[in-house]
Every structure is written in C-alpha cells, then in structure tokens.
Amino acid sequence: MQISFYVLGERYMQQDATAVSTASAVDAEAVLNFVCRLTQTVLNKSEHSLVIIDDQTDRLQALDEQLWSFDATSFIPHTLITDNQITAEKLSAPVTLISSFPPNFDGVVLNLAPTALALSKNGTLPERVLEIITPDEVSKQQGRDKYRAYRDLGYELIYYPIN
C-alpha cells in the first residue's frame, strides 16, 4: 500500500490571502481548496471511492459545502456521515466525508485527522492513503509522527512538495 504526503508550502498557503482577512482563515481556505482539487484528481484517476476522514466536524461540514461549489464546470458527488453508524450503503457515494476510518474499506483514504490511521496488515487495507501537511509547526510534527508510524509498518511512502 502506498502512503502519499502532500506538503503544502508557505507560497501555496498564501495564494488565497486576498480572499479572506486573517492568517488562520487563509490557511483553512487554502487547505479546503487543496482537498477539493485532490478529491477531483482522485475521482478522475481512480476507479475506487474516496473517504475523507477528519475528527473536526466543523471542518468536515465546511468541506461538504466547499465540494458543492468548488468548480462551476464539474460536480463532486459526495455525502457527509455525521454519525458513527457506518454501513456499506452509507459508503456508496464516490466521496464520503466521515470522522473515523470505516472497517473493511479498500478505496482511497484522505486522512485529515492529526494521527496516522490505525491500519492492520491482517485486515482489509485501503488502496492508498493521502496525508496533507501544512507549514505550521503543529502540522509538521503530526506529519513526522504519521510518517514514522507508516514507515514502521513497512508501507511505501511518497512525498509531494506543493508550492
């Protein structure tokens, strides 16, 4: 299984600086925009469904809204699951926004949570895991911790700097 780390640079994070008024809003908007672009890329290039995991419900809800209006020329079909009642039926959309890793999921996972996914080599594994790291120190440290966790499990790790 492949784990891809997308490391967003300072220059990338500043692209939307004129659209919002505070630095934290710039960062949040830049991350949401990147997640939308990455989601569209995954849908275009993969036959697998995508699960986006985040333990911050407010960010999942903001992403839900952003995905509906992200690109006027395309549509990203998705669903937001706000409860922990994960069923195959609820995971039937091409993109699912959820707070925890669903059991027996074998598609692509975009992990926005602060910790690495608890993956077992004995169970069903996702095809690929995507991790996003922002330039702030907290995110960098979380990224290092995730990298070590996945490396120690023997997964293939790929690094993509985004500027």
Regions found by a protein language model. Give the residues of each.
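Short, well-structured hydrophobic secondary-structure segments
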Residues: V31-A88
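Short catalytic/ligand-binding loop motif for oxyanion handling, primarily in non-cytosolic enzymes
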Residues: L60-A62, L119, S139
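Glycine-rich, aromatic-bearing surface loops/beta-hairpins
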Residues: E127-N163
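Structural motif
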Residues: I53-T57, N111-T115, T134-P135
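General small-molecule cofactor/ligand-binding pocket signal
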Residues: S4-Y6, T96-I98, I158-Y160
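Glycine-rich phosphate-binding "P-loop"
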Residues: M1-V31
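Mid-chain, well-packed structural core segment of small domains
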Residues: I86-L125
